[in-house]
């Protein structure tokens, strides 16, 4: 058994178990609570605010989620958490609020969203909060400049590479990240299979997950190539049943 078996034990709800039919928006406390109650692991996204806080929010631009101009990275933590998501009463939560809500009920995968030159301290800030968290949690990122800080600023916390691409230069860049202490990989499901995933899974025995699976057919494809899915918009348990 691997020390990271918990990471792939159950399907991972992408940005929580969001459902616009119920006005439950992504990366909100209701979406995270719904995922935990359903027994799904949770993926969420975090940004660094202008005053060094950590807010749970996917986009840098505010328009899609908050309906206003501006960037999340330009706001203070107080300003960011005052944003109402999708016109609802739900606010953008802090990472601490999210951790307190989930409270170890299910595993967490926290994706760090970097903006090079404006994210100094993000890795350390997230790591500090996760070190005091009693539940299972991991971090990951697309951003190579952040991944290079994982082994120092987030030592001891399971860390992964979020990746995509099917070209040789993509794989070369991904392989270069193996020197920075990553312990799992999350890959675009539509770019599977590929030599990089095959190598880390079969030769390095790293846990592998896919993103983002939205139907049973794609789930079947993912199951042939990686250990677990990150999903949204359907119930992956139906295929198992």
Model-derived features: positions:
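Phosphate-group recognition and catalysis centered on beta-loop-alpha active-site segments
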Residues: 1-241
